[in-house]
């Protein structure tokens, strides 16, 4: 039966644990050089409306490791921008491919792709959520903390799409989620209501130190996301006191892990000292995108 993952809430707690176990096994096999050609003769179409280093490379490598093929499709390669509907594109690609991964400007696009395709669709980033990132993040948290329940997850910065998925994912997995952001940059009410319905324990503050106090995880992201460039001057001013630096780490637990979905703007949302410091797990986190996405691809396309 066709299955799509457009939101982290499309997965249950049990399924997330299963995916993380599968990801750990796939990571171990890759390090050992063991063959994992589980998707021979299968093809994944990768639709990119937004460019990305990590997303493209990790999905292409994943399909290569599985003995399959990944096909890169940007706005110049498909006809959506020249009059063909998303619905017709979804139906057409379903006849060629075994799965679709989409990194899009609007969440409505990935929802339409899922609705009208007969093959699995993965949201690899939309303006609303980024479930693939959070699966990689959760794999990293599991490696370093070996649990979720009872951990304090401090989000420092913009209540953006990654924050939305982290908020919902934390609610599913039983972590306390504290968001520190300037007024007006909170996650949307819809996501806060969803987190509440999931039984999530969360709060919002405009004081980074309140959020970071006794935190097990400190997470940040760029202050100016792709598409927000027109607001750059205002955002840099508004987020000026929300930098993740050694002073902020000083109020967290000594073994706090620092995370960032990348790309980072060093010297803005995070300092070099923290990003390259002993508490940073940022590059392990980036690698784990590959393994977590491999587990997800396998679950949906095998």
Curated annotation (Swiss-Prot):
Carbamoyl phosphate binds at residues 52-55, 79, 103, 130-133, 261-262, 289. L-ornithine binds at residues 161, 221, 225-226. Pathway: Amino-acid biosynthesis; L-arginine biosynthesis; L-arginine from L-ornithine and carbamoyl phosphate: step 1/3. It comes from the Archaea. GO terms for cellular component: cytoplasm. Keywords: Amino-acid biosynthesis, Arginine biosynthesis, Cytoplasm, Transferase. It is found in: Cytoplasm. InterPro entries: Asp/Orn_carbamoyltranf_P-bd, Asp/Orn_carbamoylTrfase, Asp/Orn_carbamoylTrfase_sf, Asp_carbamoyltransf_Asp/Orn-bd, Orn/put_carbamltrans, OTCase_ArgI. It catalyses: carbamoyl phosphate + L-ornithine = L-citrulline + phosphate + H(+). Its main location: cytoplasm. Its EC number is 2.1.3.3. NCBIfam families: orni_carb_tr, PRK00779.1. PANTHER family: ORNITHINE CARBAMOYLTRANSFERASE, MITOCHONDRIAL, ORNITHINE TRANSCARBAMYLASE, MITOCHONDRIAL. Belongs to the aspartate/ornithine carbamoyltransferase superfamily. OTCase family. Reversibly catalyzes the transfer of the carbamoyl group from carbamoyl phosphate (CP) to the N(epsilon) atom of ornithine (ORN) to produce L-citrulline. This is Ornithine carbamoyltransferase. The gene is argF.
């Amino acid at each position: 039966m066709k299955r799509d993952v457009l939101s982290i809430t499309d997965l249950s707690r049990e399924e997330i644990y299963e995916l993380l176990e599968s990801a750990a096994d796939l990571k171990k096999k890759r390090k050992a050089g063991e063959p994992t050609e589980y998707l021979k003769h299968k093809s994944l179409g990768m639709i990119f409306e937004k460019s990305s280093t990590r997303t493209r490379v990790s999905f292409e490598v994943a399909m290569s490791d599985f003995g399959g093929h990944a096909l890169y499709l940007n706005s110049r390669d498909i006809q959506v921008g020249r009059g063909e509907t998303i619905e017709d594109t979804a139906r057409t690609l379903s006849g060629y491919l075994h799965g679709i991964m989409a990194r899009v400007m609007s969440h409505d696009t990935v929802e339409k792709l899922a609705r009208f395709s007969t093959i699995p669709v993965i949201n690899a980033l939309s303006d609303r959520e980024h479930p693939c990132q959070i699966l990689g993040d959760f794999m990293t948290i599991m490696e370093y903390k070996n649990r979720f329940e009872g951990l304090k997850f401090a989000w420092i910065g913009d209540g953006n799409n990654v924050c939305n998925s982290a908020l919902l994912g934390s609610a599913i997995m039983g972590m306390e989620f504290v968001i520190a952001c300037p007024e007006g940059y909170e996650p949307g009410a819809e996501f806060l209501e969803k987190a509440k319905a999931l039984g999530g324990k969360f709060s919002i503050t405009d004081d980074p130190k309140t959020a970071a106090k006794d935190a097990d995880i400190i997470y940040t992201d760029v202050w100016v996301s792709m598409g927000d460039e027109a607001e750059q001057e205002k955002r840099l001013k508004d987020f000026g006191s929300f930098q993740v630096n050694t002073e902020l780490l000083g109020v967290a637990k000594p073994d706090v892990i620092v995370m960032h979905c990348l790309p980072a703007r060093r010297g803005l949302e995070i300092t070099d000292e923290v990003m390259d410091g002993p508490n940073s797990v940022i590059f392990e986190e980036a690698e784990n995108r590959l393994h977590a996405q491999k587990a997800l691809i396998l679950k949906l396309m095998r």
